[in-house]
């Protein structure tokens, strides 16, 4: 955010500390609050379930309650970044606003509380607060511990000869991946709508981890040839025959959600949002090109040592 530091003011706060939230909201008197803060990694939530619950569930409550205590229920709108992980072991495909929730991780359970407490404050206090049920949103800024970024980083580094291979978990997991920049536009549109409502934010397309991997390598000029199934599946460079991708059971989650596919019809019809502004293929290309440049820089730095 260095390029916009002259346009913003940063305040120190923490979703686990209600006093800091009350202080900041009282100082700023905001028209809109976008709560994008969370412990947002599903796998990590199994390692730190209490922390995930404190931040992802009670953190939402603390923001809403701060607005209520400060008398801002009529002034301040609140957007809560919810998640497709709420659907968990899905009960219908694709998933829409009316699909029942079946959370399947500590992260998803905490996020479900966040979703329902937003709805409760909306109805109990007539607040303009709403949730966007975000399906996987990716970009070149995605954390390196998330699978899409792990893939594009590895593809770039392998293409530059500074990484040997890539290890992944469930190659058959199905996800609805969109570009974060487009999804933020939808968040803003939700907050400009005349009434507070909850919306699914998704592309309406579904792809496997395998397909994302294949396209990321293709963006780096490498064609992957797949052999084997399950834990024995491997991806080889079609030109050289070198093994570049393999499955490691350590990357499987204790409980895995394997079929997420969002239906953005409501956001399209009610808000006029375009979920295909950036296509899936363009998203992978953007991330792959960015991380190839990082790999080139890393290679140059190593050569200079």
Descriptions of predicted regions:
Residues 13-16, 142-305:
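C-terminal substrate-binding subdomain of Rossmann-fold SDR/epimerase-dehydratase oxidoreductases
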Residues 1-137, 181, 187, 191, ...:
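N-terminal Rossmann-like NAD(P)+-binding domain of SDR-like oxidoreductases, especially those catalyzing
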